[in-house]
């Protein structure tokens, strides 16, 4: 990926501001919808993935990300699916890291299930990645296999070990699942904090058909927080990493605990994020079906002006917020899966 321009600070005329005055500075990009696990709250076991020919090339993803950086994005997170299963994805990460060197980008990071981390951790650090999120819902090997349908937790643990050895800061993301891992959260938190890792808890979101009712999985984090407050001293902290989590300090462990609550207390009022799928579809809101095709303008011209115009039109339609609903009749609020949208 040579010959691609480097960027400097976005001019005010290019910055993205939505109709509600929110400046867009955070881009999440799904580099693939594929994953080597099948977490039951995320996708069905017999998930049909997109034809590889439908995906943007790595060069196109680089150009698209660079266009958003030119328009004021300061934080870029690569997601999936599982981003590290995309062939040659490290060449994309290394190329995007040039924007860290110019100062146009403050942070380049990714969310991963950890299965490939042992292989890539050192190279990620070498590319300028400083911290990563690892999705891990349990410490129990049998329960991990149940949730992921076939995953080996030892691979994830080896990946976390490799990431910390490489000097990467690791944050653990865990989806709170009713009657499955909710009573394990204290031990998961103490384990994470004991290894100098923050833990962020996430409510189940009604995205995509998974073949079962999410009402059976959904646990309001307000209930879980109240339960934890009976065991630990939780002190609110104003410590945002640019995402939707609200953090507390756990006095007994000294660590941070985050809550992402799209169902019980959405985070729309401060939303600074948009998402791009691996096919070049721009979603300005996680909870709405509305989307804009960026692949067409990307391929229509070697220049970026048409792409900028399409992005600006989409940002101008960004909704004020979403209202997710867990439907007992097993109908998702949003038809697309999180693995396609970019988790």
Swiss-Prot record:
Q: Pathway, according to UniProt?
A: Cofactor biosynthesis; molybdopterin biosynthesis
The signal sequence is: none
Source species, domain of life:
Bacteria
Its GO biological process annotations read: Mo-molybdopterin cofactor biosynthetic process
Q: Which residues bind [4Fe-4S] cluster 2?
A: 268, 271, 285
- State where S-adenosyl-L-methionine binds: 41, 81, 135, 205
- Sequence positions that bind [4Fe-4S] cluster 1: 35, 39, 42
Q: Could you tell me the EC number(s) of this protein?
A: 4.1.99.22
Q: Which residues bind GTP?
A: 28, 77, 111, 171, 273-275
Cofactor, free-text remark: Binds 2 [4Fe-4S] clusters. Binds 1 [4Fe-4S] cluster coordinated with 3 cysteines and an exchangeable S-adenosyl-L-methionine and 1 [4Fe-4S] cluster coordinated with 3 cysteines and the GTP-derived substrate.
Q: What enzyme class is recorded for this protein?
A: lyase
Q: What cofactor does this protein call for?
A: [4Fe-4S] cluster
* GO MF term set: 4 iron, 4 sulfur cluster binding; cyclic pyranopterin monophosphate synthase activity; GTP 3',8'-cyclase activity; GTP binding; metal ion binding; S-adenosyl-L-methionine binding
Which terms are listed as keywords in the entry? 4Fe-4S, GTP-binding, Iron, Iron-sulfur, Lyase, Metal-binding, Molybdenum cofactor biosynthesis, Nucleotide-binding, S-adenosyl-L-methionine
Where in this chain does the record put each Radical SAM core domain?
A: 19-244
* Reaction(s) the record says it catalyses: GTP + AH2 + S-adenosyl-L-methionine = (8S)-3',8-cyclo-7,8-dihydroguanosine 5'-triphosphate + 5'-deoxyadenosine + L-methionine + A + H(+)
Function (record text): Catalyzes the cyclization of GTP to (8S)-3',8-cyclo-7,8-dihydroguanosine 5'-triphosphate.
Oligomeric state and interaction partners are given as: Monomer and homodimer.
Q: Which PANTHER family match?
A: MOLYBDENUM COFACTOR BIOSYNTHESIS PROTEIN 1, MOLYBDOPTERIN COFACTOR SYNTHESIS PROTEIN A
Q: Which family does it belong to?
A: Belongs to the radical SAM superfamily. MoaA family.
Protein name, per record:
GTP 3',8-cyclase
